[in-house]
Amino acid sequence: MATIQFIQGINEEVVPDVRLTRSRDGSTGTATFRFTNPKILDASMADKGEITGMYLMDTEGQIITRDVNAKFINGKPQAIEAVHVIKSPDDWDRFMRFMERYAQDNGLTFTKASS
């Protein structure tokens, strides 16, 4: 099972919008995750701990990014945006294996951008 966590041990239930970019040679890229009204921002989660990063967990282990930001509207957190930088072809392959598992577990589909 593939899950996403912001505090280790607490799975995020909201499925994000994920946008991918990739360099022309395919060696590097970014994955931007946007969670609208994620569970981790609920008032009931305040005593669970601090958001220390985004943890992509699956059977192979975990992928970690610390580039996590909250988006506020009228002074209240409404979304979380996290960016994972992919630095090599091996990292890209590992990330895509995670996304295939996560997509299968959560009913996501891949739509290629038109160029």
From Swiss-Prot:
Presence of keyword Chloroplast: yes
Keywords: Chloroplast, Membrane, Photosynthesis, Photosystem II, Plastid, Thylakoid
GO biological process: photosynthesis
Record's keyword annotation contains Chloroplast: yes
InterPro entries, per database record: Psb28_c1_sf (IPR038676), PSII_Psb28_class-1 (IPR005610)
Cell compartments where the protein resides: Plastid, Chloroplast thylakoid membrane
Pfam families, sorted: Psb28
Gene3D superfamilies from the UniProt entry: Photosystem II Psb28 (2.40.30.220)
Subunit structure: Part of the photosystem II complex.
Protein family per UniProt: Belongs to the Psb28 family.
Protein name: Photosystem II reaction center Psb28 protein
Organism of provenance: Pyropia yezoensis
Lineage: Eukaryota, Rhodophyta, Bangiophyceae, Bangiales, Bangiaceae
Designated gene of the protein: psb28
